[in-house]
């Protein structure tokens, strides 16, 4: 069996997320599987590294699929890009060891979140950022971010769909940056619970607006109560930026 690794970019604005939900659904996984299956002449499943939600984008999503026949990488890339919609792009195709698994072999995932932080709206970024029209206190947000770095039980930063055996995850870095009207948040970790990144961003927004004290973050982590964070950041501002194996 031959195993192929795909690197994928997509604009998630019109899709129902990564994960296939049915035979004819509007998901990124479904669209790619349909084209690959047509190419190889049999139904083929792809495995994605991150099951991004509806409206979430990817700069470097990674997936893999297996094929009985030997495929030529550059021909696979050309075929997929020819028949996929233009808001999904295959940037690289690479044959890998048959034990490679995009989800289970990932070691570090990095997400980027974009907040448009001006009083006026940005019509060109409305599907690609979250608009916060009150000035955020970035200094306070940076202080709050420090409390989230490290290994913690992130139950308070998940939702009811997160039914993992362990809610402990390690955040390697969490940066808050200002640039040309935007506040951007970059977070790297060994894995994330469902909605964890959007809840982290939501908490930092609450801190930036003065609705939550930076010093309250450790107590929120300790309490493990999901209702402590009221703001779930919009999907539109979230990007899967990078995956390391």
UniProtKB/Swiss-Prot annotation:
The positions making up the signal sequence are none
HAMAP family the UniProt entry points to: TruA (MF_00171)
**EC category:** isomerase
* Protein name per UniProt: tRNA pseudouridine synthase A 2
List the transmembrane segments.
none
The record describes the protein's role as:
Formation of pseudouridine at positions 38, 39 and 40 in the anticodon stem and loop of transfer RNAs.
Q: Give the source species.
A: Bacillus thuringiensis subsp. konkukian (strain 97-27)
Q: Which UniProt keywords apply?
A: Isomerase, tRNA processing
Enzyme Commission no: 5.4.99.12
Record: active site: 53 (nucleophile)
Subunit field text: Homodimer.
From the UniProt record, which GO molecular function terms apply? Answer: RNA binding; tRNA pseudouridine(38-40) synthase activity
Q: Which family does it belong to?
A: Belongs to the tRNA pseudouridine synthase TruA family.
Q: Identify the taxonomic lineage of the organism of origin.
A: Bacteria, Bacillati, Bacillota, Bacilli, Bacillales
Q: Known InterPro entries for this protein? A: PsdUridine_synth_cat_dom_sf, PsdUridine_synth_TruA, PsdUridine_synth_TruA_a/b_dom, PsdUridine_synth_TruA_C, TruA/RsuA/RluB/E/F_N
Which biological processes are named by the entry's GO terms? tRNA pseudouridine synthesis
Q: Which residues bind substrate?
A: 111
What reaction does this enzyme carry out catalytically? Answer: uridine(38/39/40) in tRNA = pseudouridine(38/39/40) in tRNA
């Amino acid at each position: 069996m031959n195993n192929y690794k795909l690197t994928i970019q997509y604009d998630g604005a019109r899709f129902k997320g990564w994960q296939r939900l049915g035979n004819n659904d509007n998901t990124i996984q479904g669209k790619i599987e349909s084209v690959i299956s047509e190419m190889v002449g049999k139904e083929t499943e792809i495995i994605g590294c991150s099951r991004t939600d509806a409206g979430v984008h990817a700069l470097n999503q990674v997936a893999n699929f297996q094929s009985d026949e030997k495929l030529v990488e550059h021909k696979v890339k050309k075929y997929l890009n020819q028949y996929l919609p233009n808001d999904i792009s295959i940037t690289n195709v690479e044959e890998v060891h048959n034990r490679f698994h995009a989800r289970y072999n990932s070691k570090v995932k990095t997400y980027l979140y974009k907040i448009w932080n001006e009083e006026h709206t940005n019509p060109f970024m409305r599907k690609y950022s979250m608009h916060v029209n009150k000035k955020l206190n970035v200094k306070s947000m940076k202080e709050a971010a420090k409390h989230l770095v490290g290994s913690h039980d992130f139950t308070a930063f998940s939702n009811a769909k997160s039914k993992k055996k362990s809610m402990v995850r390690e955040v390697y870095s969490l940066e808050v940056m200002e640039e040309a009207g935007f506040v951007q948040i970059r977070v790297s970790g060994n894995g994330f619970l469902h909605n964890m990144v959007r809840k982290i961003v939501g908490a930092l927004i609450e801190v930036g607006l003065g609705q939550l004290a930076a010093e309250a973050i450790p107590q929120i982590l300790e309490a493990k109560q999901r209702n402590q964070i009221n703001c779930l950041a919009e999907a539109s501002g979230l990007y899967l930026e990078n995956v390391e194996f």
